[in-house]
A protein has these predicted regions:
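Glycine-rich phosphate-binding loops of nucleotide-dependent enzymes
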Residues: 1-197
């Protein structure tokens, strides 16, 4: 591939890297994955990565494993409010959920650690168009309401650029283009190669 998933894995120190990964001013390139989560990075991997044999509620609690505060229950309630289908299925095994519900669960679980940076790897993969639209509207709302930064890896360039402030085009592991989402959407080369124009 182009290296999009590898980029997310490198940020989380899940693969060998050279150079530095900075979160703000802090070098996190040698930190353990649990420390990276504590520092404010949450990763929703491609394929959702829920724990199918655990309940929806147990999956959410795993997302808060690095937290020691007393507000975990409040956050569970908050994500149940934002994703009401999860609340309806809180005792149900994650493996029995639909693809869209599993993706909502994976996102809510990642948000349980109260990240500063949310990494989303192909969040639309295998989902029906209406589910994708709903999910991306929720991402946009979450960003506007909380200021949460999201790094979204997405094959659907139109979808990604519609919600993005800034975009990167990666080919063969190299950043070949970058700029504001608006600039990229209006670039004739991007339109021809990636947007089907």
């Amino acid at each position: 591939g182009a290296g999009k998933t590898t980029t997310l894995r490198a940020i989380c120190n899940m693969c060998s890297t050279s150079g530095k990964v900075l979160l703000g001013e802090e070098d996190i390139s040698r930190a353990g994955t649990a420390d990276i989560v504590r520092k404010g990075v949450a990763h929703v991997p491609q394929g959702r990565g829920t724990f199918p044999e655990l309940s929806v509620l147990d999956n959410l609690m795993i997302g808060a494993y690095t937290r020691k505060d007393k507000e975990v229950k409040d956050d569970v309630d908050r994500w149940f409010e934002i994703f009401p289908r999860l609340s309806e299925r809180s005792d149900q095994l994650a493996g029995s959920l639909s693809g869209g519900e599993q993706q909502m669960l994976a996102v809510a679980r990642a948000l349980m650690c109260r990240p500063r940076l949310l990494l989303l790897d192909e969040p639309s993969l295998g989902l029906a168009p209406l589910i994708i639209e709903d999910l991306f509207e929720r991402f946009t709302t979450l960003n506007k309401e909380t200021g949460l930064t999201m790094l979204v890896v997405e094959q659907n360039a139109n979808l990604a650029l519609d919600m993005a402030d800034y975009g990167y085009v990666i080919e063969s592991g190299e950043i070949t283009l970058h700029g504001s989402a608006e600039k990229l959407k209006n670039d004739p080369a991007v339109q021809e190669a990636y947007l089907g124009a």
